[in-house]
Amino acid sequence: MNLNATLFAQMVVFLILAWFTMKFVWPPLINALDERSKKIADGLSAAEKGKLELEAAHKRVDQELSQARNEGQQRIADAEKRAVAVADEIKAQAQAEAARIIAQAKADADQQIVKAREALRGEVAALAVKGAEQILKREVDQAAHADLLNQLKAEL
């Protein structure tokens, strides 16, 4: 192999080029690559963070929906309880009103019975007097009356 000056010159030029590249060209390339990898890493971490935030938001939404469902069910249960209480109260009022009406009707019936009895007593007494009067008119004659009156005079 023949080593001549051009080979050495090419080696020197290559070494100068390598040194120049390492000194002036390589650092900006490395910096650009580092910045690019940093941006990619930041983007990936931001994507991961966004994914975690999305999952957390989904969990919050699920919790809020669950809470809203529970509150809705609780409100429905409360409304049903109030409705039952109101219905029971209305039933109690209706029963009390029915009892009052029944008691009033019984009192009115008793009062009418008493009035009817009094009226019947009066009628029976009148009929008895009338019947006795008619019996006395038929059975007792003037001679019997005169004899009874004479007997009463004698006893007095």
UniProtKB/Swiss-Prot annotation:
Key words, A-Z: ATP synthesis, Cell inner membrane, Cell membrane, CF(0), Hydrogen ion transport, Ion transport, Membrane, Transmembrane, Transmembrane helix, Transport
Positions of transmembrane segments: 7-27
Primary localisation category: membrane
InterPro entries membership: ATP_synth_B-like_membr_sf (IPR028987), ATP_synth_b/b'su_bac/chlpt (IPR002146), ATP_synth_F0_bsu_bac (IPR005864), ATP_synthase_B_chain (IPR050059)
GO MF term set: proton-transporting ATP synthase activity, rotational mechanism; proton-transporting ATPase activity, rotational mechanism
One Gene Ontology term, aspect cellular component: plasma membrane
CDD domains: ATP-synt_Fo_b
Membrane topology, as annotated: Single-pass membrane protein
Signal peptide feature range: none
Compartment list: Cell inner membrane
Family: Belongs to the ATPase B chain family.
Function according to Swiss-Prot or TrEMBL: F(1)F(0) ATP synthase produces ATP from ADP in the presence of a proton or sodium gradient. F-type ATPases consist of two structural domains, F(1) containing the extramembraneous catalytic core and F(0) containing the membrane proton channel, linked together by a central stalk and a peripheral stalk. During catalysis, ATP synthesis in the catalytic domain of F(1) is coupled via a rotary mechanism of the central stalk subunits to proton translocation. Component of the F(0) channel, it forms part of the peripheral stalk, linking F(1) to F(0).
Subunit annotation: F-type ATPases have 2 components, F(1) - the catalytic core - and F(0) - the membrane proton channel. F(1) has five subunits: alpha(3), beta(3), gamma(1), delta(1), epsilon(1). F(0) has three main subunits: a(1), b(2) and c(10-14). The alpha and beta chains form an alternating ring which encloses part of the gamma chain. F(1) is attached to F(0) by a central stalk formed by the gamma and epsilon chains, while a peripheral stalk is formed by the delta and b chains.
Name under which the protein is recorded: ATP synthase subunit b
Organism of derivation: Paraburkholderia phymatum (strain DSM 17167 / CIP 108236 / LMG 21445 / STM815) (Burkholderia phymatum)
Name of the gene encoding the protein in the UniProt record: atpF
